Amino acid sequence: MKFINGILFNENFKDFYSNFKNPFGESEFVFGSAVNEILKTQNRVIVAELGFGLGRNFLNIAAKFKNSDKILHFVSIEKFPLQKEILAKFYENFKFEGAKKLLKLYPTLESGFHRIKFSKNITLDLLFGDAECVLKECEFKADIWLMDGFSPSKNPDMWSDEITSQIARLCRIKAKIATYSASKKVQKSLENAGFCVVKTPGFNGKREMIRAYFNGNSGEIKDYFFERPSFKSGKNVLIIGAGIAGIVTAIKFQNLGYKTVIAEKACSVAANASGNFCGVLEPLITKKGVKLGEMHKYAFKMAVKFYKKNVPKNLAKFCGAKEFAYNDDILKRFETHDKSEIFDFNRKDLPYASIFIKNAALLRPRKICEFFSKKLNIKFGYEFSDFVESNGGYIVNFVGKKPLKCDILIFAMGSESEELFGGGKNVRANFDDAMQISSVRGQITLLRPFLKTPIPLGARGYICPKIGKRQLIGATYDRKDYENQARTFDDERNLQNVAELLNKNFVKNTDTRNLNDKKFKFEILDKNVDFNVSKQNLNFKMHTQNKELAFKNQILNVKILGSRVGFRGYSGDRFPLIGALPDCEYFKEKYKILPWQKNRAKNLPPKYLKNIYINTSHGARGLCTAILGAEILADLVTNRPFCLPKSLINELAPSRFLIRKLKKGLK
């Protein structure tokens, strides 16, 4: 890369990024003008682009939406994203409106999807990666496509027939194509993909450029049984459940202009697992490239942005966190992560190799829910019973309460979500008998502060930094255990699971290089506590009859201040359940042929229960993935591009267990 007379030149492609004399004028003439006509007739516009480059097309088009109530969703794909410093140098020479804001929000250059909330009515999705691969991970219908890569002769891969075919799949009927190119190869490729091509005068003396309009069909869709729903609806949203998932979902929809109501059966928010004294915001760490781990990375980055923007600093401390690889399986996961935007692996840490999670946070879940609840309409004492369709919407019934009406119904019931699928203590419905979902009991323990640590620490159990005169450790994990009362032996299990992090070797020698205070020293605060337990003596056994633990090394004089039981929802594959609920009878009838490759129904769209969605089964990391769940539901309801690659959206789809069952030929 080099600048020639203030214009960036790419030495690999031997081409400039823009016109010499008037880069903004060129952007407006070729690309921005294509938006003007649509702006007259539409309140929502989806613009997609191949080649973000310097961002001039985005900034030019975004300026048209400034001080407007119209909504712009701009998706841009870039294989070779530029460093922020290069963008800044270019903007110094050419004053672009919004350039400073873009620089402030510009993401790291890690491949993948990056969502930027540019303003209240403008969203920018930057998709970094090879266009052919990235396009396959997209699902939306654009109003306009901007083809702004290097010239076809210098970068033929970006103008291939496969790329054009994917663009056609992502176009609504009569969508526009705008490009500076007048290449016959580009024209033919567009025509073969179903576009009507016309040539118009080019910019600044260039003879011609292409305009095209989509009149064809989208072709075959891969994994058509996961195709997104497209419902029209009113603006009344009813959410069942006032934990973190329900609260954040309500906030998201309220910010989009929907009228939201939350129905909660308890007398307060965060009555279940979201009600803990404190909790850790961090992703689940898998081996690099595993879809579950990739989903958690996206969720984590989105959650960090959300809490930093919306939550008071006293309720969210972004201090980082450390996880220790206490067995070989975890070590194998950790060592696949080099130093990156999120992780920093340290093989030599004590008592085990560790991974430091940058921007992990110590959160106050209950207080966060209470903080948001002040802005929401929440009806307490409303225990969901059932619902019936009525005039295109729903009448939802509750135990001992008057029914509520809504256009959109969202379930965010946490561990009690299993009751919607024929399970749990109080079966309410059975939307899908193939669903794999269960409730897991977890007990946390509050102690008199015993360890001075500025960050959460995790191994078999986890320790949070002290808050005031309390320090939290946790948490047990017992599937299908519905006991509400705290149990002494569970407190003892929690103590046993953190004991190895509290011996003298750990306190003196564990790595502190990632801490904000480089001189910080871990310290045992309670001198009466003997935590000097060796690795060899960590084994213990549970006496199933009397429910007590026998320790080989006694932990002495621990002051337990209290305990709390919460229940978490888990799915059978550990992915949350986020999306539209399927019409199971339709799936079973239409997709029973899935096991046989021949005669497979191509593009037979799925059918969903109209405007009924779910955001649940977030397990132990609901503080992280619940934010992603709310964003995806907003994507679905507003029919905007997804914030995640489609392959990950499919992994989260509530219909996935039913589809897997049908693929095996099971009924």
UniProtKB/Swiss-Prot annotation:
Q: Does the keyword Iron apply?
A: no
Where do the record's region annotations for FAD-dependent cmnm(5)s(2)U34 oxidoreductase lie? 240-667
Q: What's the stated role of this polypeptide?
A: Catalyzes the last two steps in the biosynthesis of 5-methylaminomethyl-2-thiouridine (mnm(5)s(2)U) at the wobble position (U34) in tRNA. Catalyzes the FAD-dependent demodification of cmnm(5)s(2)U34 to nm(5)s(2)U34, followed by the transfer of a methyl group from S-adenosyl-L-methionine to nm(5)s(2)U34, to form mnm(5)s(2)U34.
Specify the taxonomic lineage: Bacteria, Pseudomonadati, Campylobacterota, Epsilonproteobacteria, Campylobacterales
Q: Which GO terms describe its biological process?
A: methylation; tRNA processing
Q: Write out the entry's keywords from A to Z.
A: Cytoplasm, FAD, Flavoprotein, Methyltransferase, Multifunctional enzyme, Oxidoreductase, S-adenosyl-L-methionine, Transferase, tRNA processing
Indicate yes or no for the key word Flavoprotein: yes
Essential cofactor(s) = FAD
The organism named in the record is Campylobacter hominis (strain ATCC BAA-381 / DSM 21671 / CCUG 45161 / LMG 19568 / NCTC 13146 / CH001A)
Query: GO cellular component terms?
Result: cytoplasm
EC numbers for this chain: 2.1.1.61, 1.5.-.-
Query: What is the name of the protein in this document?
Result: tRNA 5-methylaminomethyl-2-thiouridine biosynthesis bifunctional protein MnmC
What is catalyzed by this enzyme? 5-aminomethyl-2-thiouridine(34) in tRNA + S-adenosyl-L-methionine = 5-methylaminomethyl-2-thiouridine(34) in tRNA + S-adenosyl-L-homocysteine + H(+)
Places the protein is found: Cytoplasm
Record family assignment: In the N-terminal section; belongs to the methyltransferase superfamily. tRNA (mnm(5)s(2)U34)-methyltransferase family.
The record's GO molecular-function terms, alphabetically, read: oxidoreductase activity, acting on the CH-NH group of donors; tRNA (5-methylaminomethyl-2-thiouridylate)(34)-methyltransferase activity
Query: Which residue stretches belong to region tRNA (mnm(5)s(2)U34)-methyltransferase?
Result: 1-215
